[in-house]
């Protein structure tokens, strides 16, 4: 299944998790989880997928970067990964900002 569709399904089902850093960035940018959900659902493409290494486990992972507006038209940048939590696919957000470049 297409990765963007999987991410959108997680957003629609409320299966989004945020790191503490992402929560802080949301607060600084005066955004909330609804803005992120709207941005992910509105996305037409994944801007970039990068390979990374998890600093805690050392395992390789794919991080998906999405740049898309929410329903108010605010351009939002997100970086996250799809993970399985208790047998359910969840989108784990590492970074979130309304500053798209």
Locations of the language-model features?
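Ribonuclease/tRNase effector modules and their secretory precursors
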Residues: 1-101
């Amino acid at each position: 299944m297409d990765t963007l569709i999987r991410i959108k399904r997680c957003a629609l089902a409320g299966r989004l998790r945020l790191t503490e850093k992402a929560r802080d960035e949301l607060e600084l940018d005066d955004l909330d989880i609804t803005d992120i959900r709207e941005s992910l659902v509105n996305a037409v493409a994944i801007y970039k997928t990068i390979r990374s290494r998890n600093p805690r486990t050392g395992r390789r992972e794919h991080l998906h970067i999405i740049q898309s507006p929410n329903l108010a038209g605010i351009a939002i940048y997100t970086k996250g990964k799809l993970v399985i939590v208790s047998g359910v696919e969840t989108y784990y957000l590492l970074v979130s900002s309304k500053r798209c470049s």
